[in-house]
Amino acid sequence: MTGQLIVLRGNSGSGKSSIAVELRRVLGGQVVWIEQDYLRRIVFQESEEPEPVNARAIEQLATLALAHGRNAIVEGIMPVVRYGEMLRRLAAAHPGRVHCYYLDIPFEETARRHSTRDKSAAFTAEAMRDWYRERDLLPAPRETIVVQTSTLDETVARILADLSRVA
């Protein structure tokens, strides 16, 4: 049995990690959470490389998890210019179901949310503005857009409903 691939993309402060944490809480051991920022900054100590090594690691970890019947959450900013091809390949190679979500949150809201996080001391809202990419959507696979008005609970419920829907 193969797991389901869940891709959560969006700008810093858009709520990706909060969604991943809640999905993992609800789904328990069925989920492998692959966090792009952790692999990029901590494991590989990369800045924004044109062909990041962490992208290959994300692809390999997700493929391994899915092949062993686990659901894989691939979560991160993952700009299309650096990660789009890897995400397209990952989705195309997966024989099971693929669910991609883009959190389309305005910069002002991401900056406000950032000010409430523990990691707000690690970088400023001004730095976030440099990274912000408006509607950086994948050409393929198609992403479901999650808008600012969707609460954490509503977004998680929507994803859980998508996961339980019969293909």
Tell where the protein language model's regions lie, with residue ranges.
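Conserved phosphate-donor/acceptor-positioning beta-strand/loop module used by diverse small-molecule
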Residues: H94-R113
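Glycine-rich phosphate-binding loop used to anchor ATP phosphates in small-molecule kinases
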Residues: V53-P95
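ATP-binding Walker
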Residues: S14
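Hydrophobic anchor at the beta1->P-loop junction of P-loop NTPases
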Residues: L8
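Walker A/P-loop
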Residues: S17
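P-loop (Walker A) phosphate-binding loop of NTP-binding proteins
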Residues: N11
